[in-house]
From Swiss-Prot:
One of its GO terms (cellular component) is membrane. Transmembrane segments: none annotated. The modification Leucine amide is found at residue 65. One of its GO terms (molecular function) is toxin activity. AXPX repeats lie at residues 25-28, 33-36, 37-40, 41-44, 47-50. This is Venom peptide 3. It is found in: Secreted; Target cell membrane.
Amino acid sequence: MTKQSIVIVLFAAIAMMACLQRVTAEPAPEPIAAPIAEPYANPEAIASPEAKDLHTVVSAILQALGKK
């Protein structure tokens, strides 16, 4: 490897490290739940009548996949 190649590789590594440092410094956005999923987010909602529909759908999918 020539000196020029080594210098180019070092500058590329420094640039990559600087970019990674900038990316990790920015906080990740908070995930936003879909409006339809929000009623099922708390434990009390699992016992609600609306949750029965969700349970029926999940059970049907699992049965279609051959699981109980």
